[in-house]
Amino acid sequence: MSNHQSFTRRSFLKSAAVLGAVMAAQPAALSLAAAKKEKFKISLAQWSLNKRFLKRPGAEPLDNLEFAKIARSVGIDGVEYVNQMFKDKAKDEAYLGEMKKRAAGEGVKSLLIMCDGEGSIGAPQEAARAKTVESHLKWLDAAKFLGCHSIRVNAASDAKLAWNEQAKLAADGLHRLGLEADKRGLWVVVENHGGTSSNGKWLVQVMQAADHKRVGILPDFGNFYTDRVKSEMYNPYQGLREFMPWVKEAVSAKAYDWDTGAGKFYTEDRREKIEMTLDYERLIKIVVAAGYSGYIGIEYEGQKHSEIDGIKRTKQALEEIRAML
């Protein structure tokens, strides 16, 4: 072999090695860039389309089994179910199997089930609390079957009782439910959902008293009215900061009307006896600063836009804010 041939071959091998290293590094670099850009993922709460799923007068009806397809149609890959939409199907394996099949077919993850109408978790009577816990077990089982990570419950008690007594009772019910959730590897998350549960300090007190690793909070950006009749509202930014240490795998991005003139990332609720403006950018920054990087779920309840348009507008706001972080 001549010196020229040896040099050429060495040069080729060296160049090939360098090129190979560059090409191998590119996917990793792109992956890191994508991971850095996306501080959180976006999901869709079924309640955003509640008028259609519950077949309200004047609303074009939707079947619960269509939910995953709708989420995918607007570019969303995570869904949060509402038990009201399939209330009598909690133990129907064939039906749940069809839900699971459709979600998988759309490439959509089933994240949680929001549970209402199953009793008061903080009922003053021992028997009533026990019954409420029992009533939620079928939803824990359904969530497990669907591949969800959580069920969302309400920390309701008797409003006539003292603050501390309500907290004690709610914590007792939640602890019991947390024990059941732990057997299934699931979370039980409480939403700030009106009354005392919308008071940040009260709900944190409940979490401390419940004292179970499987019990946490699902913060809702818009549910901070402690008394709508009196227009009494807990500071949503303070409340969100107080809730974040207790958040597991879900945050609810409640949204109302967009493009109202308040600002690009402001959403406003102007229903009767309600006057609320939410700074989405500020709220999202609180969530991300707390180290949360999971799904943030769109829950649209506005009046100005159609349900689908409201979902799309909320998604756009979340994506634009995410790109800025």
Q: Where are the predicted features?
A:
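Short, acidic/polar
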Residues: 57-71, 130-141, 233-240, 280
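C-terminal segment of N-terminal export signals and the immediately downstream linker at the start
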Residues: 27-56
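Acidic-and-aromatic substrate-binding clefts and catalytic sites of carbohydrate-active enzymes
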Residues: 51-52, 59, 82-95, 120-124, ...
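N-terminal secretory signal peptides and thylakoid transit peptides that target proteins
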Residues: 2-20
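Active-site acidic/histidine proton-transfer and metal-coordination neighborhood
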Residues: 16-27, 36, 68, 96, ...
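Acidic/histidine-rich catalytic cores of soluble enzymes
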Residues: 78-79, 174-285
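Hydrophobic faces of well-ordered beta-strands that scaffold small-molecule active sites
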Residues: 40-46, 79-81, 110-115, 151-153, ...
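Catalytic domains of carbohydrate-active enzymes, especially glycoside hydrolases
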Residues: 63-82, 147
